[in-house]
Amino acid sequence: VYKRQMCDSTNAERKGFTMSERTVGRTFDNIFAEHRNTRIIIATFASNVDRVQQIINSAYKYGRKVAVEGRSMVNVIGTAAELGYLKIPDKTLIDIDQLKNYPDEKVVLITTGSQGESMAALSRMAASIHKKVTIKPNDTIIFSSNPIPGNEKAVSKVINELSMKGAKVIFQDVHVSGHACQEEIKLIYSLVKPKYAIPVHGEYRHLKANAGIAKMLGIPKENIFILKSGNVLELSDKEAK
């Protein structure tokens, strides 16, 4: 049976290796130290449990309570804590309704909406239609994510709306991609040694960059398949077509 490899293409245009998640933890620590007197709101992917853990670690270190907003964020954090994947110190987590009982400099809000989704919590805060959180001048708002290709305009809109409310928005050096860069893509192709390469997950230019790496590593052009949505690829023990 020939090996067929479907490989993530999102960062196929980026040289080098993806940086360690630990670098974000150091950045959080610096931001918390520099913004001791403001409320901190952090938007990130609900699925990134390790990122949430690093936020909680910094919050605990600097004496802040942590509230969570956004259905997916609440669900993931609850499940991760229950299963032991997330370590939350006692009395650190508070309900969002309790935010008003603490000074701004003593709280952190972890929220959904890092991609500018119109109905996500942060977008509703930016548009002044969130029922429980009102953006205040001098709030420090961190986008711990990069815009997924195609979401740049929506994210920029939310950042502008937050800035117009007087908030300080930080979006540089507070995210490490969860996707492989070129050297990791080369590594996985070298380890698996597939006969057929099927670049996936990305726009066409990302798939094409991935295909270029596969070809460079010796996979014949006719064995590399760049597929569009709706294309059918037939795979058998002997061939792919």
Residue ranges of each PLM-predicted region?
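Hard-cation-handling environments
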Residues: 14-144, 148-241
